[in-house]
Amino acid sequence: PIKKGFQGNDAAVVNGSHSTFRIKALQDIGGYAVHNADDVFTALKLYARKWKGVYVPEVLAYGLTPSYWGPNLLQQYRWSNSIFDLFIFRALPYLLRLKMRQIFCFMVMGLYYFLHINFFLLTILPIISVFVNQPPVNLVLFEFLSRFLVIYVLQLLILIGWGQKFLLRPKLERGVWWRSGFLEIVGSVYVFEGFMKALMRRHLLRIKFVTPKDNKGSVSQLYFFIPHILLSVASITAFIYSIYIDINLWQTKGIRIFLLMNIFILLGLTITSTRWFGRLFRRGSG
């Protein structure tokens, strides 16, 4: 549905190798863009030169995605770093030549990874709040949740419910896309790293142009979860410290809920990276 929306706003984007170009169009922009986000950058240059793109919603071939944590997380890191670099340092001169609706579509792409940064900041905020003994905001927690949950549930219903009508393969794709949700949670640490390195202009070397897709479900991916383990330890320490200060202290009562969420979510997802879980998953899927 997002790509169809882009098409309707005259902003169909280039998608990696799944695109066809006019030779004249590429010559007009000086060739295919050289950048880690080369597809988005190329599309941006083409629209700035008033070329038009078309999205064809037909499945011509089925590809693969990484089937285990490591390549998935490194892919998120590489993609986010390149998108941040593109939109922070390079995109503005081209965006100024576009129509407002095209600018909106490209900014939707550019701002997407800030959702991951937001999740990462919300993960560390309760930890910091406990040690400085200050609530992150002045509000009544349960009153806030009673209002926020309504909006959050409505958002999920739109995403999971209404989104089912846009599937290209309904029999295979219908359902709750929980894996992508877990990937966003786990990948938030790597997206934040990609953001910081983009700000420091530390560009990535394209050592691997194609992310490995082979199934290594029985191989431990624990190495990629070291940041999550450290965040879990910090959350446990903050939880214990909040009780040590005063178990009834109002500033830390609500924060403990979020610390417990950190602990269970981060440790739970870390368990999925272990070798025995990979073997169990393969046995169950086989």
Stretch-by-stretch model annotation:
Residues 1-36, 48, 69-111:
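Long helical/loop segments within the catalytic core of UDP-sugar-dependent glycosyltransferases
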Residues 18-20, 60-63:
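Membrane-embedded helix bundles of polyisoprenyl
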Residues 34, 43-62:
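Catalytic donor-sugar/metal-binding loop of nucleotide-sugar-dependent glycosyltransferases
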Residues 38-40:
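Transmembrane beta-barrel architecture of outer-membrane proteins
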Residues 42-43, 72:
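Short, hydrophobic alpha-helical packing/hinge segments within bilobed ligand-binding/sensory domains
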Residues 112-204, 222-286:
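Membrane-embedded multi-pass helical conduit in multi-pass membrane proteins
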Residues 201-220:
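Membrane-helix boundary/interface segments in integral membrane proteins
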